[in-house]
Swiss-Prot record:
Active-site annotation: R205, K227, H297, R300, H324, Y333 (o-(3'-phospho-dna)-tyrosine intermediate)
InterPro entries hit by this protein: CB, DNA_brk_join_enz, Integrase-like_cat_sf, Integrase_catalytic, Integrase_recombinase_N, Integrase_SAM-like_N, Tyrosine_recombinase_XerCD
Name of the featured protein: Tyrosine recombinase XerC
Keywords of the record: Cell cycle, Cell division, Chromosome partition, Cytoplasm, DNA integration, DNA recombination, DNA-binding
Residue intervals of the Core-binding (CB) domain: 40-145
Gene name as annotated: xerC
UniProt-listed Gene3D superfamilies: 1.10.150.130, Intergrase catalytic core
Location (main, coarse): cytoplasm
Compartments where found: Cytoplasm
Length: 353
């Protein structure tokens, strides 16, 4: 008779193997894309645009890479559409170094919609991916028209972005948040408790948390560097101050490799994003909360939702606290849940009739 535990072990091994192969395949493709982009010769106008957004606009490296990828794809499509390359050249090998202002200015609205149709049908782009490409095109043509002043018309002014479905953020309820905090245990209890407390109270990004230095905290003020290297001040409440204070009492002082870092790994280095993501998942599992796709970033959603619902925080204040450049990003936290809908109906003056 087959041992059931052996069957379970074999089933898990198969799942882990499939997951591992997916990761390897993803990073193999991504590495090829990045290495090819680095070796590619950009047209001068694209380099000028990327330099402007990198230095003057202080966009993050990931944003600059996204702009470059989207515009390289667009230039290749444009050359193919204009018949400027032979049919035997693979699409991803089309040279774009000769793209000039005349070609760029010749683009009209029909070309732009043809491009979006191409990335939908040939590249299987989802609505969010197409929306990003629209944003990249708008930024590029706005730069050429308003800043560089090298084109006489902007074809993206009438370009519509794909309609995106509204997704409510995944977040922990107040009771689940308390359950998570109360379940934290282990050899790094104080550190992990401080980390999760900051997530739940301040709505930090993971990248912001791992980069906190000791001197970034002055009494009840925490200074963080967010997206686009933008600095913002977050005021710490009593729970955060106490959690940090308790952690600092046990924070290692000898053999520390990064003395500036607030949060340290077991190897006495600055804690990594991967470690933070792991420890959050570990404590979620310990609190029996792992089945709802919660993660470290979902704790940021939780903080925003709880502040909006229980703290009477207006949307503009929440935008500043979270470090959003656009208030439309913050508006996803103005959702209501079933209990609020039920409460609204029960407040109807006719509900007792």
């Amino acid at each position: 008779m087959l041992d059931f535990s052996l069957f379970v072990w074999y089933h898990r091994l198969c799942n882990y193997t499939k997951y591992l192969f997916r990761i390897i395949r993803f990073w193999t493709i991504k590495r090829k894309e990045l290495s090819f982009m680095e070796a590619l010769k950009y047209p001068p106008i694209l380099e000028e645009f990327l330099n402007y957004f990198s230095t003057v606009k202080a966009r993050s490296p990931n944003t600059i890479k996204a702009y470059a990828y989207d515009l390289i794809l667009f230039f290749r499509f444009l050359k193919k559409r204009r018949g400027k390359v032979s049919d035997d050249i693979p699409f991803d090998e089309i040279d774009i170094s000769d793209v000039d202002i005349d070609l760029i200015e010749s683009v009209d609205l029909n070309d732009l919609y043809a491009y979006l149709s191409f990335v939908t049908n040939e590249r299987s782009n989802t609505p969010p991916a197409r929306a990003r490409k629209v944003a990249s095109l708008r930024s590029f043509y706005n730069y050429l028209y308003r800043k560089a002043k090298v084109i006489s018309k902007n074809p993206t002014q009438e370009l519509e972005s794909p309609k995106l479905s509204v997704r409510h953020p995944i977040y922990l309820t107040l009771e689940e948040s308390k359950k998570l905090l109360n379940s934290i245990d282990g050899p790094f209890k104080e550190r992990d408790y401080a980390i999760i407390t900051l997530f739940l109270n301040c709505g930090l990004r993971v990248s912001e948390l791992v980069n906190i230095n000791l001197d970034d905290i002055k009494e009840d003020k925490l200074t963080v560097i967010g997206k686009g290297n933008k600095q913002r001040t977050i005021y710490l409440n009593e729970a955060c101050i106490k959690a940090i204070s308790d952690y600092l009492k046990v924070r290692p002082k000898e053999g520390v490799k990064d003395k500036k870092a607030l949060f340290l790994s077991k190897r006495l280095k600055r804690i990594s994003v991967k470690t933070v993501q792991y420890l959050v998942k570990k404590h979620l599992k310990h609190a029996n909360l792992e089945g709802k796709k919660y993660s470290a970033h979902k704790l940021r959603h939780t903080a925003a939702t709880l502040m909006y619902r229980y703290g009477n925080v207006d949307i503009r204040t929440l935008q500043k606290l979270l470090g959003h450049s656009n208030v439309s990003t913050t508006q996803i936290y103005t959702h209501v849940d079933d209990s609020q809908l039920r409460e609204a109906v029960n407040k109807n003056p006719l509900s007792q009739e």
